[in-house]
Structures are given as structure tokens and as C-alpha cells.
Design a protein with these regions (language model features):
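A bilobed periplasmic-binding-protein/Venus flytrap-type ligand-binding module shared by bacterial periplasmic
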Residues: 152-163, 257-262, 286-299
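Bacterial signal peptide processing site
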Residues: 18-22
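C-terminal motif of bacterial Sec signal peptides marking the signal peptidase cleavage site
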Residues: 13-16
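A structural signal for short loop-to-beta-strand junctions that line the ligand-binding cleft
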Residues: 135-148, 273-282
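Bilobed "Venus flytrap"/periplasmic-binding protein-like clamshell domains
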Residues: 60-88, 92, 96, 150-218, ...
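Pocket-flanking alpha-helical
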Residues: 79-83, 95-136, 155, 210-215, ...
């Protein structure tokens, strides 16, 4: 039995006994395995179906993957990534940890309580630069591994409100997410390039999208912002029972936004995404991404991105958004310094 296997066995034994430990052990003890994690145990018995050639030598070790809520997108993708790492034959012991998502994951990774974190690239930018949510709390050790898929800023407006453009939000009752949340920052930035402030709105409500959807249904508000992968189940549910307009952003305004905040990307969604949408629309999105701390070895960072991009089928099987992850888009929207180990892999595949 190798030293790392012995350590892993001891850690499991302590967990079963309810023993205490340092923060990393607590994170492991509190982690909830996804279905993909559970399948990992079976995969280890038969070797799994993971492509793992050409990896760099490493000591392996425990990898806590900070994701998001169990009902979100990050959690199943984190489970799939843990499955890939556990079956790579490099003695990694990985587990997906349910968390409060982006902001919390930055803290977990930079404090050493998680090795890998799923976050939005705008949050990564704020953390690395000490702005917005991280004003006075700069996380200079945060490093990027890769970008994954777009999380689209969507504006849902009741048809009866008459809102068709962002300028039409003036004088209307609008939900902007929780105070200080990533969604609210997106709202302020988008309104800013349109010359709109909160004072121009009829009413500003700080609501989650689930709360906002209920108030759109009851007529208490006219529109709500949500930043999420498309299609969003919450938006889909709302559009199924009520006439809803998805509000586009003009391409010239999208360009202006991207010039000012380079972590955004412009994209077009097809008319088939949501009920009631009858034409292609221009929207903007931030990118989901994987981050680590600068202390992670080059070898581990290299192995993680190599294993991820050479086993994308496993990611796709865990969640539809896994199918949006692509090597040729891995650095699109990268908002912070790339870990040198990850950069080594990207440089190799370009040759």
C-alpha cells in the first residue's frame, strides 16, 4: 500500500467515526457525493473509461472540488470531474463539495479548503482585482484553469408590461437579484452602458429569480434579471405559464459592454430556446470557469485540464451544459492569470 493510499484510508476512517480535523478535513467530511462520485467507486474496480495518457508525474492526493447547490449546474459537473480524476490512475482522490457557488468558492480555494472551484469569470475578475464583491479583499493568488460554458444574462419581462428593449425598463418595476450578488453587478453594468441608473427605474426589487418569477406572475413587478445557462429551468417554467418577452441587448451596446468589461462575451440564441421566443436574439454572457490557487503544482494543474478536455463525454453525460465545453474556447473570457501548468497544456495542443 502506497503512502497516499494509506493516508486516504485513514481519512475515510476518521470521517466514518465523525472525528474532527483541520479545515480541509472538515470540507471533505461535509462534502456530498453526486451520483457521478458514487459511480467512481465502481469505475475504480474496472478501470473506468477515462482517457489518461501522457500525464505528468505527481504525488496525487486529495482534491476537493467546490461546486454550487445540489440543484444547480456546477454540482453534477463537479461530480463528473471528480470521476475523471479518480479514474486517471494518478492516485487522485477527488470529491465534489456542495457550496454557495462562486463567491464562496473563491474563499475556499484561496484559503486552501478546496483545490478546485467552479466560479463565474466576472467574480474571478473582481476577486483578483479586489473590486465589487471583493472590495478590500483582493485574492491575488487566484489562478484560472479554463473557461467552460456561457452563463447568460437574461431579462424576463411580462408581455403586458410592454417592455421590448432595455431602454423600456425606465419607469418599470425590476428585480435585480440579491444585494451585492453577481447578478446585481451584471444589472448595473448593463444599465450603465445604456445610460440608465436605478433612479430611472420605477422600482428596484432585490429578489432571487424564483421570487421574481412569482411576482411577475402576480403582476407585482414587470421584469427580472437572471444570470444562468440557457435554457434556464426557472425561466422555462415561467414562460410555460405566462406570456414572457426575453429582452435582447443591441450588438453595439454589447460591444461597448465588452470593451469596458472584457469578461463578457456576446452570443446569439436561437428561437427554439424558450416558449414565446420567435426570433434569434443578441445577448451577453459571463463564462463559468475553473479556478485554483497559485500554490497548486504545475503538474496537477496540467493534469486536470488535460484530463478534462480529453474526457468531455463524461462531462456531457453529467449535464447538458457539459456539451458546451470545448478546447477551442477554453480561454475565451479568461479574466485572470492562467495557472502556468494549465497554460503548458494549452501551448502543447496548439502546436
Amino acid at each position: 500500500m502506497t503512502l497516499m493510499m494509506l493516508i486516504a484510508l485513514v481519512a475515510v476512517t476518521l470521517t466514518a467515526c465523525g472525528g474532527g480535523g483541520n479545515k480541509k478535513e472538515e470540507a471533505a467530511n461535509n462534502a456530498t457525493k453526486t451520483e457521478a462520485n458514487a459511480k467512481t467507486e465502481e469505475g475504480k474496480e474496472d478501470g473506468g473509461a477515462i482517457t489518461a495518457e501522457g500525464l505528468m508525474e505527481t504525488k496525487g492526493g486529495f482534491m476537493s472540488i467546490a461546486t454550487g447547490g445540489t440543484g444547480g449546474t456546477y454540482y453534477p459537473l463537479g461530480g463528473a470531474l471528480s470521476n475523471i480524476l479518480n479514474n486517471a490512475g494518478v492516485n487522485y482522490t477527488a470529491t465534489a463539495q456542495a457550496t454557495g457557488a462562486s463567491v464562496e468558492n473563491v474563499e475556499l480555494v484561496t484559503k486552501g479548503d478546496a483545490e478546485i472551484g467552479f466560479i463565474q469569470n466576472d467574480v474571478a475578475y473582481y476577486a483578483a482585482n479586489g473590486t465589487e464583491t471583493f472590495d478590500g479583499n483582493k485574492k491575488s493568488s487566484l489562478r484560472g484553469l479554463c473557461c467552460l460554458y456561457p452563463e447568460v444574462v437574461q431579462i424576463a419581462a411580462s408581455a403586458e408590461s410592454g417592455i421590448k428593449t432595455i431602454d423600456d425598463l425606465k419607469g418599470k418595476k425590476v428585480a435585480v437579484g440579491a444585494p451585492g450578488s453577481g447578478v446585481e453587478v451584471n444589472v448595473k453594468q448593463i444599465l450603465d452602458v445604456h445610460g440608465i441608473t436605478y433612479d430611472d427605474l420605477g422600482k428596484v426589487d432585490y429578489l432571487s429569480f424564483a421570487e421574481a418569477a412569482d411576482q411577475i406572475k402576480s403582476g407585482q413587478i414587470d421584469a427580472a434579471f437572471i444570470t444562468a445557462a440557457i435554457p434556464s429551468s426557472a425561466y422555462t417554467e415561467l414562460a410555460t405559464t405566462h406570456d414572457i418577452n426575453l429582452i435582447p441587448i443591441a450588438e453595439d451596446k454589447a460591444k461597448e459592454l465588452i470593451e469596458k468589461y472584457p469578461f463578457y462575451v456576446n452570443l446569439h440564441i436561437t428561437p427554439t430556446e424558450y416558449k414565446g421566443q420567435d426570433k434569434e436574439l443578441s445577448l451577453v454572457a459571463v463564462q463559468s470557469m475553473l479556478v485554483v490557487d497559485e500554490k497548486m503544482s504545475d503538474e496537477d494543474a496540467y493534469n486536470i485540464v488535460k484530463l478534462l478536455f480529453e474526457n468531455l463525454d463524461t462531462m456531457k453525460e453529467s449535464h447538458a451544459r457539459g456539451g458546451d465545453i470545448a478546447l477551442d474556447k477554453a480561454l475565451d473570457g479568461m479574466s485572470i492569470e492562467v495557472h502556468p501548468g494549465a497554460q503548458k497544456y494549452f501551448d502543447e495542443v496548439k502546436k
